[in-house]
Regions:
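Conserved catalytic core of nucleotide-sugar-dependent glycosyltransferases
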Residues: 146-147, 157, 161-245, 249, ...
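Short internal beta-strands
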Residues: 103-108, 184
């Protein structure tokens, strides 16, 4: 009997220790999660809870179901210039994307025919394509509030960017939780120099004052989801903003981040201000520029490109009288959600 008690005691001990270990690991992982304030006002866990409760909500009305169905779809907008061969590859690729309502092509090849006739001759296609021919080759043409856009979600893509279907689907699911922000794959930041002049930098660029890296204050719209309202918000910006974009043929993405940040300042509840964007780490994002038979190189190859973007940061700050961009270090990854930002490859 005594030996039986000993065996039972050992058995209980073996059961208790794994449970204690699991509790300790769970507590440690929870402690590692940053509070909402550390993420520039992004309440990640709150957003996830809201999404879960909405899915589990039992009785929903017809109107609510229709609204949810509309939320399940999005529109792709691609502005293109002198890259028809790549464009056709992209159109074929994006036809396989789930929940895609339509693709709008902003055609900046002034005086040249669109490939619409060729596209139609190879029907049927699961996703309709609309070509919007432009009167002039302007960078900000893609930011028009086109009447054809009837989904809240817009995925804007550069005409040399191929994004994998899983990346798109994952980012769309993230955007539905952060639909008032830009959710995209290319983060950038502004850096304040000791003289009060702003400099445009990449994600890893160190801040000379804090020596901090791995934070961002912008998410570029060349591969990003955002709400269609921001197209009209951009159109409503001061004429000086539009003139700056036209003057440089650059910086429309920076201007959009300013516009979104200002909109969030005005419409967000609470004291913590949200950053303009949320960074989603891509798994497979490719640049197809070298595949273009035209040999046309994007404007980012120009030697003055980065200088222009620093100039735009300072000029926009002058126009608005404030620097509205907020920093965040949140990165959302398909293999760790949520996670601290660190997109450097270990390979």
């Amino acid at each position: 009997m005594r030996s039986l008690r000993c065996l039972l005691g050992l058995r209980r001990a073996y059961l208790v220790w794994p449970i204690l270990l699991l509790l300790l690991v769970g507590a440690a992982l929870t402690a590692l999660l940053p509070p909402a304030g550390d993420q520039g006002g992004i309440d990640v866990l709150g957003a996830l809870r809201r999404a879960t409760s909405r899915k589990e909500s039992p009785a929903r009305g017809r109107a609510e179901e229709e609204e949810e169905e509309e939320e399940q779809r999005f529109t792709i907008v691609i502005q293109t210039y002198n890259r028809t061969d790549i464009l056709l590859k992209l159109l074929n690729h994006y036809q396989a994307v789930p929940h895609l309502q339509q693709i709008i092509i902003v055609w900046n090849n002034i005086g040249k025919q669109t490939p619409l006739k060729l596209w139609k001759s190879l029907q049927p296609h699961p996703v309709p394509v609309v070509f919007k021919e432009q009167a002039s080759n302007l960078m900000r043409n893609r930011l028009q509030a086109f009447p054809e856009i009837d989904t809240d979600a817009v995925l804007m893509l550069d005409d040399d960017t191929l994004l994998s279907v899983p990346d798109i689907s994952f980012a769309f699911s993230v955007w539905k939780q952060f639909s008032d922000q830009i959710v995209g794959f290319v983060p950038r930041k502004h850096v304040s120099t000791p003289g009060g002049v702003y400099s445009y930098g990449s994600f890893e660029l160190q801040d000379p004052e804090t020596a901090g890296g791995d934070k961002y204050s912008m998410v570029l719209i060349g591969a990003a989801f955002f709400h269609r309202r921001y197209l009209q918000v951009f159109q409503d910006q001061p004429a000086a903003v539009h003139a700056l974009v036209d003057e440089t043929q650059n910086c429309d993405d920076i201007a959009v981040n300013f516009a979104v940040a200002l909109y969030l300042r005005e419409h967000s509840a609470g004291t913590v201000k949200k950053p303009s964007g949320v960074f989603v780490k891509p798994v497979d994002l490719r640049n197809l520029e070298k595949d273009a038979s035209s040999g046309y190189q994007g404007m980012w190859h120009r030697p003055e490109h980065l200088l222009q973007r620093s100039y735009c940061l300072n000029r926009l700050t002058q126009i608005y009288g404030v620097m509205p961009l907020r920093f965040s270090n949140l990165m959302i990854s398909q293999f760790g959600f949520p996670s601290y930002a660190n997109h450097k490859s270990s390979a």
